[in-house]
Amino acid sequence: MLPQSFTERMQGLLGSEYEEFLASFEHEKYQALRLNPLKRDDMSVITEKVKQTFQLQQVPWAENGYYYTKEDQPGKHPWHEAGLYYIQEPSAMAPVTLLSPQPGERILDLCAAPGGKSTQITSAMEGEGLLVTNEIHPSRAKILSENVERMGIRNACVLNETPEHLADIFEEYFDRILVDAPCSGEGMFRKNEVACEEWSPENVQLCADRQDGILECAARMLVPGGRLVYSTCTFAPAENEGSISCFLAKHEEFEIVPIDKKELGIPEGCDGIPACVENPAPGITGTLRLWPHKLRGEGHYAAVLQKKGELPEGYQPVSATGSEKGIPAKNLTKDWAEYFNFAKETFLEEQTIKAGLCTAGEGFLAFGDNLYRMPERMPGVKGLKVLRPGLHLGTLKKNRFEPAHALALALRPEDVKHVWKLSVEEAAAYLKGQTFSAEGEKGWYLICVDDCSLGWGKLAGGIMKNHYPKGLRKG
């Protein structure tokens, strides 16, 4: 049952389209997945295989996004655990398309959990540059970190910070910022009954006030000439056109970049609505409203903002914490000799030397007994709540090195000397913790399904010991 004050407002907002909008709530929610191009250099073969396995149809506004049917259940296929795709609501893919991330940039996903948009950003970055992905709530930040790991991401730093603290540290630091703002969730009413039950006009205003503060912080962190994308999953004007208009009234250095809906494959009638707020910002019609009665997705709003000005030639932004140097090479070689022994025995050096996984030098960071490979141009992490400072390489255990699950998921078969290929049925057994009889050279093996890494195995005495994390095993 939709709240009365919500339906009254929507009737005034939509006019003659209201009945069509209301009827959309009777339709089952649309479901989609987004393929992860970080898993393979050439995605064509595996993409066709996924398309043949599931009944996929292209999401118009997302290059690697596809609708699937409820019967497909891609979340139960081993490909999901291999990070070959991320299951994501189709409308939620639009903001990152609008952000247009580029390889080598510094990008911030400020309100990032559960991680769908962060993983989409890194796909577009092709693993190059720095993504700082942040979530203020600890439990949700943990889920964000887990999804960054599952998707095999190397160039992300996962934080659990407030926007205010980040703004103090990263003044004019990022080339692009995504603010997928916490909101009243009206666009998710069809998908999530709890969002409907918890809704109130007071909560809408509370969310709008919070969004104003988040946007203020984001503005401080964006470089001149940088792009900021603001998005919500609500229909509330106060949180959409209202938040953007309020922000622009205080920030003449920002302007709206009109969204080309036709180029995105979005139907007519999805413009921002100036009449729904007092004192609308110039160009507010150039923002985007995704309506569930007009397209195959839930309700979303997005605005693209540009910060005026240009960076001086050769400009290198510096965080208040400086840059992270990590472990000096001489100490790294001495303290982490077991890791480099593992790397020499396991990696094909010519494939992994570019990623800096084989040789001692700047870029390695130790957190206790855990070793990480930091993203390029990593800021200093002192004073920050860090969940994942980069790619987790592994752990020292009683003078031996044990590789991390995250490392396996970030590798490709061509990166390592030993690969153990499983069928889909064998992969399902591996995910349950099953060991396998095997012959071959003893040591660590990258376990793969359809040439997508799934985890580690260690061969000794004719047995491939299963090193898939016990906490992730499927029964």
Briefly describe each language-model feature range:
Residues 1-13, 17-53, 298-301, 308-475:
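Polybasic, low-complexity RNA-engagement segments
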Residues 102-103, 165-178:
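A short acidic, Gly/Pro-enriched loop at the edge of an enzyme's catalytic core
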Residues 104-113:
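Conserved class I S-adenosyl-L-methionine
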Residues 114-127:
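Conserved SAM-binding loop of SAM-dependent methyltransferases across substrates and taxa
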Residues 126, 222-224:
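Helix-to-beta-strand junctions that scaffold the AdoMet/dcAdoMet cofactor pocket
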Residues 136-171:
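S-adenosyl-L-methionine
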Residues 139, 175-216, 233-240, 250, ...:
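Mobile active-site "lid"/loop adjacent to the S-adenosyl-L-methionine
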Residues 174, 227-230, 235-366, 370-372:
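Class I S-adenosyl-L-methionine
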